[in-house]
């Protein structure tokens, strides 16, 4: 899995890194008009924001969820911009004590947008502080210790909380129920990713043909963050191995060098599928046995490698283990067999 501040171990890893943050900000759309894709989400937010502005009220608390790299942070920034408000940003793992959250809340100005990334990782004691802040714009603070301790109530200015998570199922019901707006971000189709690549190429000053942008988009696993990362690497290839212009052939040659195929799969994806098909007869195979067979950690397979393979229909997760689909057999050029006809391992 990617390190928070180093480069991603896989170029197609959708998780962001600290090294990429400045580059992502430079490519980020700043308004709903500039935002590409997520049509339903964009249209709903436009209505909610215009209505809130018309009433001179803060936007209802908003929860954004979906896979990494789809634009949750971007939307939080856009919400603040569209509301004419300042954005204050934090994350669940950073807010490990009630006092940490209280310090942020008490420094908010009226109408501010507070963005908490990975909100599912808030501890229960910090969540308890958040409940009255979200509902009543107040917090209860305990002053002193022992018998002399007393609780005081502090009023907060009206604000909007925007929470983001890749794992909405881990949110507690009391927290989830306090969000008035809940939006799910989905993977992007190739045509929308192509527009994102073309827009980013313009920002980077890279000459890109439409077919070249589409070739990058096709391999970006439905994820703008991956598309922008691939664009930067293809730009390097075009400058060194070609005339600096990204054509379809230049993009394809660069992707071959980067070992990302036309389906957006890399060597790690293919190793997993080959192990299920060739070593375990197509499955079902337990995750521990599969991890041992290809020399990867169980958590890496479960959280990083498997989700895209399952989404694209190459792999099935069953109660008996992982099973390769006909789609996987076709990809590997192996005559297919009925799913689950292999032996049970693990």
From Swiss-Prot:
It is found in: Cytoplasm. The RuvA-RuvB-RuvC complex processes Holliday junction (HJ) DNA during genetic recombination and DNA repair, while the RuvA-RuvB complex plays an important role in the rescue of blocked DNA replication forks via replication fork reversal (RFR). RuvA specifically binds to HJ cruciform DNA, conferring on it an open structure. The RuvB hexamer acts as an ATP-dependent pump, pulling dsDNA into and through the RuvAB complex. RuvB forms 2 homohexamers on either side of HJ DNA bound by 1 or 2 RuvA tetramers; 4 subunits per hexamer contact DNA at a time. It comes from the Bacteria. GO terms for biological process: DNA recombination; DNA repair. Pfam families: AAA_lid_4 (PF17864), RuvB_C (PF05491), RuvB_N (PF05496). This is Holliday junction branch migration complex subunit RuvB. The lineage of its organism: Bacteria, Pseudomonadati, Pseudomonadota, Gammaproteobacteria, Chromatiales. Belongs to the RuvB family. Homohexamer. Forms an RuvA(8)-RuvB(12)-Holliday junction (HJ) complex. HJ DNA is sandwiched between 2 RuvA tetramers; dsDNA enters through RuvA and exits via RuvB. An RuvB hexamer assembles on each DNA strand where it exits the tetramer. Each RuvB hexamer is contacted by two RuvA subunits (via domain III) on 2 adjacent RuvB subunits; this complex drives branch migration. In the full resolvosome a probable DNA-RuvA(4)-RuvB(12)-RuvC(2) complex forms which resolves the HJ. Has 3 domains, the large (RuvB-L) and small ATPase (RuvB-S) domains and the C-terminal head (RuvB-H) domain. The head domain binds DNA, while the ATPase domains jointly bind ATP, ADP or are empty depending on the state of the subunit in the translocation cycle. During a single DNA translocation step the structure of each domain remains the same, but their relative positions change. It comes from Halorhodospira halophila (strain DSM 244 / SL1). The gene is ruvB. The keyword Glycosyltransferase does not apply. It catalyses: ATP + H2O = ADP + phosphate + H(+). One of its GO terms (molecular function) is four-way junction helicase activity. GO terms for cellular component: cytoplasm; Holliday junction resolvase complex. Its main location: cytoplasm. Keywords: ATP-binding, Cytoplasm, DNA damage, DNA recombination, DNA repair, DNA-binding, Hydrolase, Nucleotide-binding.
């Amino acid at each position: 899995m990617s390190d928070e501040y180093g480069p991603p171990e896989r170029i197609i890893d959708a998780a962001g890194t600290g090294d990429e943050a400045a580059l992502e900000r430079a490519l980020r759309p700043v308004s709903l008009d500039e935002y590409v894709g997520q049509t339903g989400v964009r249209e709903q937010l436009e209505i909610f924001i215009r209505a809130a502005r018309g009433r001179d009220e803060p936007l209802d608390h908003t929860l954004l969820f979906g896979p990494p790299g789809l634009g949750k942070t971007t939307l939080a920034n856009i919400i603040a911009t569209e509301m004419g408000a300042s954005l204050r940003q934090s994350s669940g793992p950073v807010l490990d004590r009630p006092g940490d959250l209280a310090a942020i809340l008490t420094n908010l100005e009226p109408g501010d947008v507070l963005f908490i990334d990975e909100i599912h990782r808030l501890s229960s004691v910090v969540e308890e502080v958040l409940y009255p802040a979200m509902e009543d714009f107040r917090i209860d603070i305990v002053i002193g210790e022992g018998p002399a301790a007393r609780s005081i109530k502090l009023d907060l200015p009206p604000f909007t909380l925007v929470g983001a998570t890749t794992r909405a199922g881990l949110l507690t019901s009391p927290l989830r129920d306090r969000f008035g707006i809940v939006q799910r971000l989905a993977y992007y189709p190739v045509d929308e990713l192509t527009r994102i690549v073309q827009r980013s190429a313009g920002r980077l000053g890279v000459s890109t043909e439409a077919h070249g942008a589409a070739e990058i988009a096709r391999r970006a696993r439905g994820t703008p963050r991956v598309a922008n990362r691939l664009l930067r690497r293809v730009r390097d290839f075009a400058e060194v191995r070609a005339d600096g212009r990204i054509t379809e052939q230049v993009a394809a040659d660069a992707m071959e060098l980067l070992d990302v195929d036309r389906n957006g799969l890399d060597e790690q994806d293919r190793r997993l599928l080959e192990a299920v098909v060739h070593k375990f007869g197509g499955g079902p195979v337990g995750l521990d046995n599969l991890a041992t067979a290809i020399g990867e950690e169980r958590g890496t397979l479960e959280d990083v490698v498997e989700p895209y393979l399952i989404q694209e229909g190459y792999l099935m997760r069953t109660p008996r283990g992982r099973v390769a689909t006909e789609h996987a057999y076709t990809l590997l050029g192996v005559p297919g067999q009925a799913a689950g006809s292999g032996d049970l391992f693990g």
